[in-house]
Every structure is written in C-alpha cells, then in structure tokens.
Amino acid sequence: MTGIISTDVLIVGAGPVGLFAVFELGLFDMKCHLIDILDKPGGQCAELYPEKPIYDIPGWPSISAQGLVDKLLEQIHPFKPDFTYNRMVSSLEKLEDGSFRVTTDENEVFEAKVVVIAAGGGSFQPKRPPIPGIEPYEGKSVFYSVRRMEDFRGHDLVIVGGGDSALDWTLNLQPVAKSVTLVHRRPEFRAAPDSVNKMYAMQEMKQLEFRVGQVTGLTGADGQLSSATIKGGPDGDIEVPCTRMLPFFGLTMKLGPIAEWGLNLHENLIPVDTEKFQTSVPGIFAVGDINSYPGKLKLILSGFHEVALMAQAAKRIVSPGERIVFQYTTSSTSLQKKLGVVG
C-alpha cells in the first residue's frame, strides 16, 4: 500500500482538548497528526461561539473561545503537529504489530501506534427550526452560530430559543444590534437563572423585547430578511423587524463511524478508565466530552487533566521499554529546549 501517512499518535478531533493533547504528548517526544471534520482547528469553540467568553480556564479570568484556541496553537507550535481538515475518520484496523491503520472518508490512510479520540460529541450540525421558507435565507441573513459579532451590528436581530445559547447571545449582541427581539414559546427558560434575570431586567429598561410565541413566517427577498411573524403570544400575530435571525434549536450530534470501532459505547459516549483514559481497546484513548467515567464533568479543564495522564500511558506504547522520567517544565532544561524557551 502506498501513500500511508505514519505518525506516533493520531488524534481524532482538533478542539481545545485535542490541541492540548499535542502539548502533553510532545513533551514525551511523540509526533502527532490531527484529523478534524471542520476546516480549521478549535472544534465547537471556533465554529459555534468564537467570540463567547470562557471564565473557567486557570490563569485566564476571561478569554474568548477563539482566543483560547489561538493560545493553544501558540503553545503547541514547537512540536510542529500535522493537521488534516475536512475529513471524517471512517474505518480502523488493528495491525499485527499492535499499531492502527485509520482510513478517512477521502480514502487517506494513516498508521499510528496510538489513537486518541478527542472528538467532543462527534460531528455536529444545528437543528433547523420548523419555520416555513427559511432555507433561502440561511447563510445570508439566518445564521446558526455567531462567528463575528460585527456581522450583526446595526441589524434588527431576532433570536429564537430558550437555552443558554439564545440567552447568552441576546445579552452579548444587544449592545451591537439596532434592536433585539428574543422569541421563546413559553416564559420559562432552560438557561442560567442569572442570564434570564438579566434579560428580563433589560426588557424592563426597554433595551430589548421578549416575545412569547413562535416564529411562523419570514418576509424578505434575495436571501435578505426584512421581518418575521410571531404567533401564539398574548398580542396575537405580530410582525417584527428582522434583518438577521439566530435560531438556537440545539445541535444534532453524530459520532459517525467511530461508533463501529468496538469501543463498548454507552449512550454514545466511550467508557474509559481514570488512570490512563484508555478505552476497551488497548492503544486507543478517549479524552474530553467524548468519554465517560464516574464523576465525569464535561469541562475543557477536565479534558486538559485527562490528556496529561493519557500522554504518560501513550508513551509506554510508543516507546516500550523506555524509562519514563517525570519532569517539570519549570525546572527541566530538556523540556524547556523542546519548548524553545532556552537555547
């Protein structure tokens, strides 16, 4: 077979946890190649909410999702990882020597001694709301994520939904948009109480509108919205100005072919041990939101902890028989040389 791409560790998923795995593995001199279904690194952080602030990363009282991705890319730069984007892993085969052969949906073939699954919830796509005639406006004036807040400046914005994303963007985009109308089918929300209270306070100050009901119609031309019809509220059918719309009806998460890899999935999650974060298949590890174990918290912080322990176990597979010496980056000259901070 020709055209095989060989590496020490193949990482499936280039979100924050997959990126930090490169750092921890790199400290042990393991070469990494990352595959992601998106067209860039960062996972959901970069694709769905790049400008959304994150508050629970140690040392960063507040950092945007894209800012975190950028810092991680800077941090792993000394290890020169390889990336393959716009690809889904399709098949996995364990070879006689214990290594793995992974094929993508474009028939690219990778071989690695270790496979790390850091695929979050798998591939995802937003759920389309049941609004008649929405398709021609998608990508032009109807969007399912916020990549740049500036894209909404000066627009009459209608946000539809009752979860955290809907409330967060209602609050964050209110200073930018010309007007903001939040639409939810009932006055109760599935969002953080503090966000709900802030929204109601802003409504009292007439800084935004909240309408109980459902969007049942759109008006516009050539992909550009001009208004939206809301039905079901106490005022009957009303038409509100709308030049931008953000529907938040959740995501459809698909694990894809990984589900067929014999990893004893439970509720679409991969069970792992908490010593090495290894799956039921030796040599395959799962870190981040994709894994499951008692006490699991779906936090980026938890994923960072998991990859630190995973890297030690991966090193024993990649370099069997080699003595592993635990070192601190603060005091180890050899590690500091790898990071490029000393000559």
UniProtKB/Swiss-Prot annotation:
Its EC number is 1.18.1.2. Its cofactor is FAD. FAD binds at residues 36, 44, 49, 89, 124, 289, 330. It catalyses: 2 reduced [2Fe-2S]-[ferredoxin] + NADP(+) + H(+) = 2 oxidized [2Fe-2S]-[ferredoxin] + NADPH. One of its GO terms (molecular function) is flavin adenine dinucleotide binding. SUPFAM superfamilies: FAD/NAD(P)-binding domain (SSF51905). InterPro entries: FAD/NAD-bd_sf (IPR036188), FAD/NAD-binding_dom (IPR023753), Fd--NADP_Rdtase_type_2 (IPR022890), Ferredoxin-NADP_redctase_2 (IPR050097). Keywords: FAD, Flavoprotein, NADP, Oxidoreductase. Pfam families: Pyr_redox_2. Binds 1 FAD per subunit. The keyword NADP applies. Belongs to the ferredoxin--NADP reductase type 2 family. Homodimer. HAMAP family: FENR2 (MF_01685). This is Ferredoxin--NADP reductase. It comes from Mesorhizobium japonicum (strain LMG 29417 / CECT 9101 / MAFF 303099).
